[in-house]
């Protein structure tokens, strides 16, 4: 697999119907504007939308991790960073030059990226792009295995292949051309990937149970009580696929966490006090074992609240239903 070269220096500004796109230098010319999305992607009146992703990891918790190398654009998969709504960073993932899904970040991340700084949103997009590139080159990959499902832990809609979560649908994972409901976003994202990665037939409609899923689990979660917050860290590479303390396989991109005392299965809303971003995680491991830290998040959860790049962050913790 080739690495993904995310173009860095700002080369110019172009306009689109819905946003102004900042184009980073040394990009292939085909990346200079968002392609029109054909109506063939939508088998019904439903549209497509956004993302966040999940593989497997495990038991011993760590206080830091080595980030994966930056993804380099391939002939099939590419990433286009640009200015999104409200001057936020947006990173659009393309397959065969067709925009599939956009990852939304913050205005601070947009400024950081123009200064060559690594951002959580870019890392999240690179993780998805890297895995799609791997799947597309696998000998026995079948694009018809790409479907929409429901994460049993977070109750969020996901796009998956077989039992592997490729990305999670949330408020910061949207369709490039417009923002739709979570079910519509999930359906169109899955159908675009099915078609562009191998010409599989579209999914006509989602089961009724998936059509009412919420975009943000924590919005619907009722707080039972606030517990002691403090410094959160994260762990991932090196533990992926290993057994957690409760016996399951650790998935670094799933929304899970390690806590010293909370019962396994407890759902905890973790809020980054610096930026207000929240995520609901499920406790499936023990830790952290470094003094002064109260919770150890999976890599996916750390990205969701913006502490992946910094390694640690000050958080509030609430037990939720």
UniProtKB/Swiss-Prot annotation:
CDD domains: DPBB_RlpA-like (cd22268). GO terms for biological process: cell wall organization; peptidoglycan metabolic process. Its EC number is 4.2.2.-. One of its GO terms (molecular function) is lytic endotransglycosylase activity. InterPro entries: RlpA (IPR034718), RlpA-like_DPBB (IPR009009), RlpA-like_sf (IPR036908), RplA (IPR012997). Keywords: Cell wall biogenesis/degradation, Lyase. Pfam families: DPBB_1. HAMAP family: RlpA (MF_02071). PANTHER family: ENDOLYTIC PEPTIDOGLYCAN TRANSGLYCOSYLASE RLPA, ENDOLYTIC PEPTIDOGLYCAN TRANSGLYCOSYLASE RLPA-RELATED. Lytic transglycosylase with a strong preference for naked glycan strands that lack stem peptides. Belongs to the RlpA family. This is Probable endolytic peptidoglycan transglycosylase RlpA. It comes from Synechocystis sp. (strain ATCC 27184 / PCC 6803 / Kazusa).
């Amino acid at each position: 697999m080739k690495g993904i070269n995310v173009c860095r220096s700002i080369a110019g500004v172009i306009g689109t119907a819905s946003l102004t796109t900042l184009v980073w230098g040394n990009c292939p010319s085909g990346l200079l504007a968002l392609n029109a999305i054909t109506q063939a992607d939508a088998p019904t009146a439903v549209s497509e939308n956004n993302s966040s992703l999940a593989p497997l990891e495990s038991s011993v918790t760590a206080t830091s991790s080595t980030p994966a190398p930056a993804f380099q654009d391939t002939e099939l998969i590419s990433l286009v960073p640009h200015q999104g709504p409200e001057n936020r960073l947006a990173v659009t993932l393309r397959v065969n030059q067709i925009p599939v899904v956009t990852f939304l970040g913050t205005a601070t991340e947009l400024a950081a990226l123009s200064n060559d700084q690594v951002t959580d949103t870019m890392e999240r997009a690179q993780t998805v792009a890297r895995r799609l590139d791997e799947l597309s080159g696998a000998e026995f990959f079948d694009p018809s295995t790409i479907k929409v499902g429901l994460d049993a832990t977070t109750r969020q809609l996901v796009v998956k292949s077989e039992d592997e979560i490729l990305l999670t649908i949330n408020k910061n994972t949207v369709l490039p051309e417009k923002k739709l409901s979570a079910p519509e976003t999930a359906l169109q994202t899955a159908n675009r990937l099915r078609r562009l990665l191998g010409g599989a037939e579209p999914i006509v409609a989602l089961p009724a149970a998936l059509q009412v899923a919420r975009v943000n689990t924590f919005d619907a979660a009722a707080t039972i009580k606030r517990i002691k917050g403090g410094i959160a860290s994260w762990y991932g590479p090196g533990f992926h696929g290993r057994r957690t303390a409760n016996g399951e396989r650790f998935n670094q991109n799933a929304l899970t966490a390690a806590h010293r005392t909370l019962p396994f299965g407890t759902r905890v809303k973790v809020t980054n006090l610096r930026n207000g971003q929240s995520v609901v995680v499920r406790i499936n491991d023990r830790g952290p074992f470094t003094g002064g830290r109260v919770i150890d998040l999976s890599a996916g959860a750390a990205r969701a609240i913006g502490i992946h790049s910094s390694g640690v962050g000050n958080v509030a913790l609430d037990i939720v239903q």
